[in-house]
């Protein structure tokens, strides 16, 4: 499956890392399987985002970052997708942002509406962390730029041409200061 992706796309979001903490050997293998210029986005393990809910995650986060680091220039952002019932906890978000080494770009997908406020946006901006703009069955999250790159997850089954035009307009509007956009 990976061979199929690297032939057709320039970026892939790895969801397997959400279900199982990857080893350095596994991640290095992914890097070796991709051509120059290919980018991987790794989704943070549920152990960090769902089970621990960003609390006391020093050790698993360090392990995850060490594994991710083996991708070198093929590494894109690390995506932290929080559970829908996880309400705003800026203290925990701040701790995780401080723990992730500055060499990593990070994006956060918040799925509880309490996260969508200026305090959270300011905290993300302070670390150049992207607010993931997600389009789901429940609706779209606020389109707010908080980093010098964008991260959008379009997860509907189908998009009409008009839907895609609206997303292109959103990306154009938000992306004036972006170096990259991951869609």
Regions of interest found by a model, annotated:
Residues 1-182:
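Residues lining hydrophobic/aromatic ligand-binding pockets adjacent to catalytic sites
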């Amino acid at each position: 499956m990976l061979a199929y992706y690297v032939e057709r796309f320039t970026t892939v979001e790895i969801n397997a890392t959400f279900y199982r903490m990857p080893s350095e050997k596994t991640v290095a293998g992914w890097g070796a399987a991709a051509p120059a210029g290919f980018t991987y986005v790794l989704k943070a393990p549920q152990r960090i985002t769902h089970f621990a809910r960003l609390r006391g995650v020093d050790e698993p986060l360090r392990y995850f970052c060490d594994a991710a680091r083996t991708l070198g220039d093929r590494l894109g952002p690390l995506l932290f997708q929080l559970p829908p019932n996880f309400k705003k906890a800026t203290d925990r978000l701040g701790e995780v942002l401080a723990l992730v080494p500055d060499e990593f770009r990070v994006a956060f997908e918040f799925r509880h509406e309490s996260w969508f406020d200026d305090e959270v946006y300011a905290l993300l901006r302070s670390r150049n962390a992207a607010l993931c703009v997600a389009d789901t069955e429940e609706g779209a999250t606020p389109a707010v730029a908080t980093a010098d790159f964008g991260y959008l997850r379009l997860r509907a089954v189908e998009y009409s041409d008009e839907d895609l035009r609206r997303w292109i307009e959103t990306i154009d509007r938000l992306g004036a200061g972006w170096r990259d956009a991951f869609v």
